[in-house]
């Protein structure tokens, strides 16, 4: 399963990307996460269906210092060959 998600709310400046990388690594999920200029956090999640669903559920709360107001989830069709979960440059 491959999912592209965009998380809105108080999600920048609160450690959300590092929190998400840690949770993804715990669940053996690959992909990336980055801040968007719009103030959102964007991520690509690749892995087991159940584990990705669990991670998306965790993202609805986020780390204790965040306040998530919305998550947009889309299927991702393109190939992604990296077998790690990375924090990448802002967009």
Q: Locations of the language-model features?
A:
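Intrinsically disordered, low-complexity, mixed-charge
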Residues: 1-91
């Amino acid at each position: 399963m491959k999912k592209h998600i965009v998380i809105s709310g108080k999600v920048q400046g609160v450690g959300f990307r590092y929190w998400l990388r840690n949770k993804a690594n715990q669940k053996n999920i690959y992909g990336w996460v980055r801040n968007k200029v719009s103030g959102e956090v964007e991520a690509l999640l690749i892995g087991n269906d159940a584990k990705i669903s669990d991670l998306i559920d965790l993202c609805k709360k986020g780390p204790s210092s965040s306040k998530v107001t919305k998550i947009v989830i889309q299927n991702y069709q393109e190939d992604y060959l990296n077998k790690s979960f990375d924090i990448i440059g802002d967009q």
